[in-house]
Amino acid sequence: MEDFVRQCFNPMIVELAEKAMKEYGEDPKIETNKFAAICTHLEVCFMYSDFHFVDERGESIIVESGDPNALLKHRFEIIEGRDRTMAWTVVNSICNTTGIEKPKFLPDLYDYKENRFIEIGVTRREVHIYYLEKANKIKSEKTHIHIFSFTGEEMATKADYTLDEESRARIKTRLFTIRQEMASRGLWDSFVNPREAKRQLKKDLKLQEPCAGSPTKVSHRTSPALKTLEPMWMDSNRTAALRASFLKCPRK
């Protein structure tokens, strides 16, 4: 699973996920399913935000290529992926500027057009069950909830899906592709079932122990199918700024 995650997701997403797990004392090499789940959630948050802007009148527009007009600003503020201190600083700044109620839990995004925080969910289960769990945890009508599943289903507060149909379809397609590729590698069942994941981990650890006298052959090639998974959605104009903002610690 770890190899799949590192090949499947944008390096910046992987780096952010590793940083988030280490902040809570978790090891991406051991808790590989959680590693995959965090990367998936991060990517959905970025895809939700990318290419969406607001103009000087506060109207929402989509710009998919080229340099956006200087008067445009990103419609969504990405909060997910930042360290907790910085994330709360961003939330507090938004609340002080807009007068919006401060959320009890850190949200994933802030929508400048609708003046609301958004909680994004990505589930391997039924969307309505996960939606209710999120709603019961947040207990705030001010935070908008939007849930996506790997089967193409979605659910949002008051059936308000925020984004246009094409943008949401892009997210659903990506999730469905991840599921298919996991399944083709025998990873999907363990991703859905934690008990199966533990058994798979023990099996993997045993397989990593080389037999005495046996030659070891390692392939570093990427399959043609996996190449289709490489995310093309990243807004190149924004990537550098995000990296500087989210990843302040230089690589060693």
UniProtKB/Swiss-Prot annotation:
Its main location: host cell. Keywords: Decay of host mRNAs by virus, Eukaryotic host gene expression shutoff by virus, Host cytoplasm, Host gene expression shutoff by virus, Host mRNA suppression by virus, Host nucleus, Host-virus interaction. The record marks R195, K198, R199 as: Important for efficient shutoff activity and nuclear localization. InterPro entries: PA/PA-X (IPR001009), PA/PA-X_sf (IPR038372). One of its GO terms (biological process) is viral RNA genome replication. The active site is at E80, D108. Gene3D superfamilies: Influenza RNA-dependent RNA polymerase subunit PA, endonuclease domain. It holds the Pfam family Flu_PA. Transmembrane segments: none annotated. The record marks K202, K203, K206 as: Important for efficient shutoff activity. GO terms for molecular function: RNA binding. It is found in: Host cytoplasm; Host nucleus. The probable endonuclease active site in the N-terminus and the basic amino acid cluster in the C-terminus are important for the shutoff activity. The C-terminus acts as a nuclear localization signal. The C-terminus is recruited to host protein complexes involved in nuclear Pol II RNA processing. Plays a major role in the shutoff of the host protein expression by cleaving mRNAs probably via an endonuclease activity. This host shutoff allows the virus to escape from the host antiviral response. Hijacks host RNA splicing machinery to selectively target host RNAs containing introns for destruction. This may explain the preferential degradation of RNAs that have undergone co- or post-transcriptional processing. Belongs to the influenza viruses PA-X family. This is Protein PA-X. It comes from Influenza A virus (strain A/Seal/Massachusetts/1/1980 H7N7). The gene is PA.
